[in-house]
Amino acid sequence: MWLLEKAGYKVGAAEPAARWAPSGLFSKRRAPGPPTSACPNVLTPDRIPQFFIPPRLPDPGGAVPAARRHVAGRGLPATCSLPHLAGREGWAFLPESPHTRRRESLFHGPPPAPAGGLPAAQSRLHVSAPDLRLCRAPDSDTASSPDSSPFGSPRPGLGRRRVSRPHSLSPEKASSADTSPHSPRRAGPPTPPLFHLDFLCCQLRPTRESVLRLGPRGGQLRLSTEYQAGPGRLRLRLVSAEGLPRPRSRPGSGGGGCCVVLRLRPRVRPREQQSRVVKCSANPIFNEDFFFDGLGPPDLAARSLRAKVLDRGAGLRRDVLLGECETPLIALLPPLGGGLGPGSSLAPTHLSL
């Protein structure tokens, strides 16, 4: 029916025999006037209402962020106070607002001129070649994180300059830049490197590394000891075992893996602590921590550490002793004279027993 109406046929009401009567392909000329639309709520290019944008209120404080001034300066000047703007076809459209732009668009503009009295770059990322540490310089003065608002993103000019410059500065330039009186500095300890836990350990309590000789068949254990005098807690870190003898092949014993059992004598609670069972080899690596609580300074001098390396039996098999040793506990501890005093050192102490 729609196709017939488009072709010029219409229903004939005068002749009942003929249901369809042809009409002219061109309809009669209508009277001049605004056309009536069946859907007045649909926006078409020939019908766009006039939008009104209220003027921007002046800032009472007078302090506008630098990123906001930069984005507003690149936009259309004096457009926010106009009711609308007319394009080439005469259509009304909304002006571009900095609040509706994506954050990535801030990096595509030309480098702006730096404000007077402000440094060119206030936060830098340094990459050191040996261990690829990413750390933030201590002179960064960022007020808020970049994820809090789109205006917290770095300026586009700074990012472009940072890419074009070489990867690192020479020691002479770095020292001259650090000693400049105009370079801002923030009081406080330096920020530790990201993705690196070794730097955090150097600011903790001093530790002592020891090597315990095993008998009777040889081998040794590597330990790292740390003591907290406040809670009376002793931490023993079992690093690895080296040079362990091969387990003797006996029927009904061994074959389940290697483990280390640590015990303080005279006995304290817990009586003994056992490491996880690893694959039996000549140099197994454990990297486990053992904690003994309730040990005051007088108790440390009266106790000793006993360590046994076992080849665990699988199923109903018996354990096989690979080596054992016993050492006075006071010989494994770091100096207890005051942690970070002038006479103490943060460097680990090596001891071979």
Curated annotation (Swiss-Prot):
CDD domains with a match to the protein in the record: C2
Positions with biased composition (Low complexity): 140-150
Alphabetical list of Pfam families matching this protein: C2
Superkingdom of the organism of origin: Eukaryota
Domain C2: 217-343
Membrane-traversing stretches: none
SMART domains: C2
Protein name: C2 calcium-dependent domain-containing protein 4D
Record region (Disordered): 135-191
Lineage, top ranks: Eukaryota, Metazoa, Chordata, Craniata, Vertebrata
